[in-house]
A protein has these predicted regions:
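Extracytoplasmic small-molecule ligand-binding "clamshell" domains
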Residues: 22-99
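Periplasmic-binding protein-like
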Residues: 41, 120-128, 203-239, 261-284
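Ligand-binding cleft/hinge of the Venus flytrap
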Residues: 49-53, 65-75, 153-172, 202-207
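Extended ligand-binding regions for polar small-molecule ligands
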Residues: 61-71, 138, 143-144, 151, ...
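Acidic, polar ligand-binding/catalytic clefts
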Residues: 65, 77-139, 279-291
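Short helix-initiation/N-cap motifs at beta->coil->alpha
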Residues: 77-89, 132, 170-182, 219-221
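A ligand-binding cleft/hinge motif common to bilobed small-molecule-binding domains
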Residues: 86, 102-111, 156-161, 184-185, ...
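Ligand-binding clefts/hinges and TM-proximal coupling segments of bilobed small-molecule sensing domains
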Residues: 155-170, 243-296
Length: 296
């Protein structure tokens, strides 16, 4: 399988993808000879840019690469860097064939795109500086908090503030790197995001020991690979390939590589063992949305 890299300007690509909708995903890939994989630039360990040559890696990137190698072995992979904000429209209109960032599966998004079986369950928490006295989200009442635009953390913070009668002043970064810079520079007291992504940002920072993850869990979220809606053949192929990786133990090996072992670029290990929830999902795969977890 051949590989190439493509960066995207969202405003252009959103309008360029309409023609792709008339074809099934497999037809589009077969006619073009390539498959467009949506990735992220700063979402370690799930999907992120590594090195000056802008290669991409991460847990979800590797899972996607393995799936594509099985279901479209002759296609060239073209990597397209996305953000949390433009992922939905670019997958929905067919510009991106498969989205491999850390995207939460929820009912609202299911109206726009389809999700594969869940491959990670995140917990949304807060990162603060190591010497910060903050141990609870409630202690951030009236303080500035960083969050990344387009992430579910924004809605969770709004809900938490309303439910607990606290004022959470949220400043949005365009991506996780920019949001972390708000914390790093002191312009924010905390950065709220999925625990695994917080750990990845901290591990790749200039001072990994200078930060800690604290506070109550704002929400548990199923994270999954995504693709166009109303394309059951492509969904079945992706799901079948992922389930095969789960049952063979290969998915667990990929998890260990990115969550327990040292990862690039700084060789820092996140040391995030697989949760019991994900272990159960590997035994009993499903594509249930966030709302199903809230009802449990």
């Amino acid at each position: 399988m051949k590989f190439s890299i493509k960066m995207v300007v969202a405003a252009v690509a959103v309008f360029a993808g309409g023609a792709a909708m008339a074809q099934s995903t497999f037809d589009k890939i077969n006619s073009s000879g390539k498959v467009v994989m949506g990735v992220r630039e700063s979402s370690a360990p799930m999907a992120y840019a590594i090195g000056s040559n802008q290669s991409f890696g991460g847990y979800h990137v590797e899972l996607c690469e393995r799936v594509l190698k099985e279901i479209v072995p002759k296609a060239k992979i073209e990597y397209m860097a996305l953000t949390a904000q433009n992922t939905m429209p670019l997958v929905q209109n067919g510009t991106v064939d498969i989205g491999c960032g850390p995207t939460t599966n929820n009912l609202t998004r299911q109206k726009q795109v389809a999700f594969a079986v869940t491959t990670y369950v995140s917990q949304v928490r807060a990162a603060v500086k190591a010497d910060s006295p903050i141990t609870s989200i409630k202690q951030l009442d009236g303080k500035n908090i960083a969050a990344s635009a387009g992430t579910t953390a924004v809605q969770l913070l709004r809900k938490f503030g309303k439910d607990n009668n606290v004022t959470l002043n949220t400043t949005l970064g365009k991506d996780h790197f920019e949001s972390f810079m708000l914390l790093e520079s002191g312009r924010a007291e905390a950065f709220v995001l999925d625990d695994n992504l917080l750990a990845g940002v901290i591990a790749n920072s200039a001072n990994p020991k200078g930060y800690k993850i604290v506070g109550e869990v704002l929400g548990s979220e199923p994270i999954a690979i995504l693709f166009r809606n109303e394309d059951p053949a492509f969904k079945k192929a992706v799901d079948d390939s992922l389930v095969k990786l789960m049952k063979s133990g290969e998915l667990a090996k990929v998890y260990d590589k990115w969550f327990m072992q040292p990862i690039p670029p700084k060789g820092q290990a996140l040391n995030l063992p697989m949760s019991d929830t994900l272990k159960k999902l590997i035994q009993e795969p499903n594509d249930k949305p966030l709302e199903a977890y809230a009802d449990q």
